[in-house]
Structure formats: C-alpha cells, structure tokens
C-alpha cells in the first residue's frame, strides 16, 4: 500500500478542504512513506455522510494513533476497473442489462475527470479496453460480448492489479459484476486477498443471486465476494435480477462521489509485514468503511 504499491502523495492543495481536488497525475517522492486511505462514512441507516472536517477523523495503525497530515472531503478523480462476467449463465437479458448498466455507470454517473478500463471474464479474463474514457470504444467492446464458458473472478482481479498500479488518477477502485461462483480460476481467494493487501484499490462487487434453481457449485458466492470487498474498504451488493444492476451501480457511483481521502506518515517502516488500520469518526455514531490493513512493501 506504500512505495511501489502506488501510495498516493497528495499535492499540497489537498490538505485544505476548501480547495478543489487536484485532477492531474499522482506524484511520488523518494523516502517519504505517506499512506493513503479512502474512507466512506455512513450513519446507522446507511445514509452517506459528507462534509466532515479533518479533525473529525481518527486513524490507528496497529492500534497506534496516527496524525492525519493530508485530507480532502472534496471529490478526488478515480481510476476504475470494471470486471464483467461473460460466462454462459450471463446470456440473454442478463448481458443486455449488464451492457446498459455499465455504460450508464461509466458515462453518466461518474465524473469526466475519471478514467477506467474494462475486463471481461469467463474461463479466463480478457482486457477489452485500456485506461481511457472513449465512449465509442467501450460501446463496441460491450456489444461484441458473447457469453460462454466458466467463471474466473479471481483471475480477473489478479489480472487487473498491474493496470491499477499504472493508473494516472489518485484513487483506485474495481467493480466486479457476476452471477456465478468462481469455477475456472488458477488463482485462489487467498491469492486475491494477498494481492489486495499490497494494493491501494478498494473493490465493489455486484452479485446477481437469482432465485431460480442453479447447480450449487455455480451459484454466485456472496460470502467469498464480501471477504474480498470488505477487507479492501468496498462492499458487495446482492441483487435478485439483472434488472437491478442499474440501481446497484448507481448506489456505488454515489458512494464513489462522496468519499474522503486521508493521508498519514506511518510510524512503521516498510518492513514487508501486515499492518492493521482502523478509521473512526470521533464523537459521532457514524460508521466508517476503509481498508483494514496493508502489507508494507520493502
């Protein structure tokens, strides 16, 4: 999550919450170990809380209070990867609904300062578009999709990691859309969790869990997806039908547009060890979602 893992070093303007977010590339400085966090704050009912000041936040690493040195409650541009299931079970209306939801999500609900890439996966992942936001290119890629084969969610996430690392935007996120359990990956759930500990990306998943009878080993596994998303600071949306994809991705977009970005200089060295992170809002009954830790790469 630091140094070679794309730890963000904010421009000085980000420390002033009245300033607009910087919209150019991330910057790096040798020898500075600034750890960056993206945090989502909600009330008990799940409503997003925006506009909190820096001093409302407390950050703990391995139980030790850290000093928040960089902060913004303004929207920060994001580099986002969409990982779309095109296994055989996504045929017909499901792929049609997925195409429409992804298009609306990327070009209507996100900000023009954001960039993204697309990966489709069945028995293996395939990069459809590189970083950018060219509407015609995305449309052609989505229209050309023909569902077939198995499901390799874990391989798709692993495949996306180098692309996330080489983004030009400050925040990083992945959105996985799938209707099935992983049946074809070489990577394991443990491999994915390990990779995400070394990345600053947070992960969202939209799981289509149809009430229709399906073979047990192919039905979507929300618990496995939650293990991935919750640890990274994201979350899993479970929907009953592909018709609900629009609403689910709209909720994710609203969250991406309402997050806080915090930075602190860790009191720990880059020792190759896992360090836990906890973020809380002092004096308020709010819930804060952020990654639960990272591996400090040497």
Where are these regions (language model features)?
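Scaffold/interface architecture of coatomer-like assemblies
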Residues: 16-298
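Hydrophobic h-region of N-terminal signal peptides that target proteins for export
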Residues: 5-17
